[in-house]
Amino acid sequence: EMCIRDRPDSEDETFEGIDLLDPTKLVPEELAEVVLVGKLTLDRNPTDYFAETEQVAFHTGHLVPGIEITNDPLMQARMFSYLDTQLTRLGGPNFAQLPINCPHAAVNDNLRDGMHQTAIHQGMAPYKPNTVDDDQPELATEAEGAYVHLPREVSGPKVRANPVSFDDHFSQATLFWRSMSQVEQAHIVEAYTFELSKLFEKPIRERVLGVLANVDAELCARVAAGLGLPAPEGDPARGVVPSPALSQVTTEVGPVAGRVVGVVAGPGADLAGIGRLRKAVEAKGAVLHVVAQVGGELTKGRAKETVERTFLATRSIEYDAVVVAAGTVANDPRLVVLLQEVFRHCKALGAWGDGAAVLEAAGIDTSAPGVVLGDSVAKPFTADLLTALGRHRAWDRAV
């Protein structure tokens, strides 16, 4: 879904006391709601990585009439740096003529020659004004769809200084921390503790803790405990109202289209059950991969399944959920690693029949949230698995 947030244009360029030109500040969604204006649909992937990915030229100055940039100094700098980057990366100003960057309308400018120039221009004067070509080409008018800058009045002294809001270094960090769920806060603490553990200079660790103390006392104390250091006192911002919209953790069940389910199977696995699970998963737009010790095909009676991944050549990062089929034997340490990683990353896990014994042999707590068990691949089992998959992660497992 494509959404925007609309705020009134004020002379002081602030909203609810927040400086809109300060890139270190954000406006909580609770103060300026998100408005749905349409949907952007990605209908295909690149087919040529070089032509369509390496040569793409993003540029903040690629605007349609009616949209202008603000006086944000960071944005102003990006207007220069993006163009400068494309000139360097793609060999000159004609990057708009590369197929991936070419607009639907023909490129019609005064740029001549150089790398990537594909047009054969008529006339003698690639500039204006001129006399030799009767002052042509003529600039497009607003009626013809040209980009027009709206006139704006500018006044006041120009100084090399930042607005006073730039001196507030901590209130929005405090807002962010206090808006996180328990599991997100745990991730933040672990991230700080991990990175600071790589610092071998104790004074630097202590200085960072001093900064965190001004964000939130609990955050500082938890990181300090992980480092084995005392937590200093700080002065966190007061009266900060959390913004639940900042949290990415949700209890809602989302769509599963495009997600990948790995089904672990052995030579004696229930292939008919795998077939039923595949049908249920693919009906929702998800993908199922059979994972086994060796490649090739698994056969049992009339049922047949192709092995898409092997224990040697796969890792948990490829899957949003992993299910162990009945009839599978846990006799490979690589399978144990796969299952433990999926469990540790709070992804959905499942098993039917004696496949549950494989989870238990890997040290998986089968009563934990997001672990789905069943006697067979019946509707209740597939429904519970798709629900767990739609929740993305079983975050309760990490708290």
Give the role of each language-model region.
Residues 2-4:
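Short, small-residue-biased leader/transition segments that mark boundaries at the very start
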Residues 345-352:
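ADP-ribose/adenylate-binding Rossmann-like module
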Residues 163, 182, 186, 190-344, ...:
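Extended, subdomain-level signal for the structured scaffold at the beginning of enzyme domains
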